């Protein structure tokens, strides 16, 4: 009986913790944040004229289109931006 109860508790905990949360870098890559539900991409935005210097980083749901002035790079693994 105790084994059944313990098994039920373990299965419940595992099932409740199945939702994966993505972690994305903030502007300074030493710091990151856990993305809220629905934000399943990390992004990095930078000006086309200065591609080595990111202007903004974070979590996003859909990768924006780049323009002539601004470029976006999106990815979907932890701290990939």
Curated annotation (Swiss-Prot):
Disulfide bonds join 24-42, 35-59, 63-74, 75-80. Shows cytolytic activity on many different cells by forming pore in lipid membranes. In vivo, increases heart rate or kills the animal by cardiac arrest. In addition, it binds to heparin with high affinity, interacts with Kv channel-interacting protein 1 (KCNIP1) in a calcium-independent manner, and binds to integrin alpha-V/beta-3 (ITGAV/ITGB3) with moderate affinity. It comes from Naja sputatrix. Its main location: secreted. Keywords: Cardiotoxin, Cytolysis, Disulfide bond, Membrane, Secreted, Signal, Target cell membrane, Target membrane, Toxin. InterPro entries: Cytotoxin_Cobra, Snake_3FTx, Snake_toxin-like_sf, Snake_toxin_con_site, Toxin_cobra-type. This is Cytotoxin. SUPFAM superfamilies: Snake toxin-like. One of its GO terms (molecular function) is toxin activity.
